[in-house]
């Protein structure tokens, strides 16, 4: 059930910049399986755990990182083809995707408390749009996808663009993500990083990557918002 913000709630200049997959929607493992299909179609065979370790970075970097592990090389055209195959495969898995516990309540709470927030994802709009619809996110919410920036995570471009769209300083922003790539990007952007365990990374990994706090999922973060700058006015 949605929690109502306390009377007198305020956020100052604090804004929240959310990753999408594994942070707001339970879609990481569907992406893993979709990537396995795409890679196998290209004659590249990898264990799913190796694929999982790279989820969260941009598709191009993702392909390069996995190919480095296997010793394969592909052309830019083939790398683009693998990304298209992934998007097609993910479309077949998306019916299994659900919002993570507390995701809708967390976003509704921040909206009611007038805390600005945006979504910044390394996914392209084709796959991200499928997940965004599950959350019922309104059209006026800034959504920054891989298509809109030069470099995706672990570069800071996505979060910098999201902060700019909100009209806030990146130093006044809290980046919420489930992967080490989210938190490395947050650190490089000079934002406060908060990790969630809902994407499969461990607490220590997220802390080493720069997480100020680590919570189980959006519902857990909602219960502890005062720890990251959203609190009652004194």
List each language-model region with its residue ranges.
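Substrate-recognition "cap/lid" segment bordering the active-site pocket of phosphatases
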Residues: 96-98, 118, 124-175, 180-189, ...
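Metal-dependent phosphoesterase signature
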Residues: 45, 67-105, 113
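Active-site neighborhood of HAD-like aspartate-dependent phosphohydrolases
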Residues: 2-52
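Short acidic-hydrophobic, aromatic-tinged amphipathic segments that line or gate anion-handling sites
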Residues: 213-217
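Surface-exposed amphipathic alpha-helices with a cationic face
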Residues: 104-111, 183-188
């Amino acid at each position: 059930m949605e929690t109502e913000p306390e009377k007198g709630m305020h956020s100052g200049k604090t804004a929240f910049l959310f990753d999408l997959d594994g942070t707001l929607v339970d879609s990481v493992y569907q992406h893993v399986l979709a990537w396995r299909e795409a890679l196998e179609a290209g004659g590249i065979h990898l264990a799913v755990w190796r694929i999982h370790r790279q989820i969260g970075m941009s598709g191009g970097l993702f392909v390069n990182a996995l190919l480095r592990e296997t010793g394969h090389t592909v052309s830019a055209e083939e790398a683009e083809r693998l990304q298209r195959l992934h998007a097609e495969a993910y479309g077949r898995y998306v019916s299994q995707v659900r919002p993570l516990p507390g995701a809708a309540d967390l976003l509704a709470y921040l909206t009611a408390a007038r805390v600005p927030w945006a979504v910044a994802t390394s996914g392209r709009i084709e796959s991200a749009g499928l997940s965004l619809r599950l959350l019922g996110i309104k059209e006026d919410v800034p959504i920054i996808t891989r298509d809109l920036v030069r470099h995706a995570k672990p570069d800071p471009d996505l979060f910098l663009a999201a902060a700019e769209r909100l009209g806030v300083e990146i130093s006044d922003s809290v980046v919420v993500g489930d992967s080490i790539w989210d938190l490395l990007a947050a650190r490089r952007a000079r934002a406060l990083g908060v990790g969630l365990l809902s994407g499969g990374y461990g607490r220590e990994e997220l802390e080493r990557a720069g997480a100020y706090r680590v919570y189980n999922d959006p519902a857990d973060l909602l219960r502890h918002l005062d720890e990251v700058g959203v609190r009652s006015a004194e």
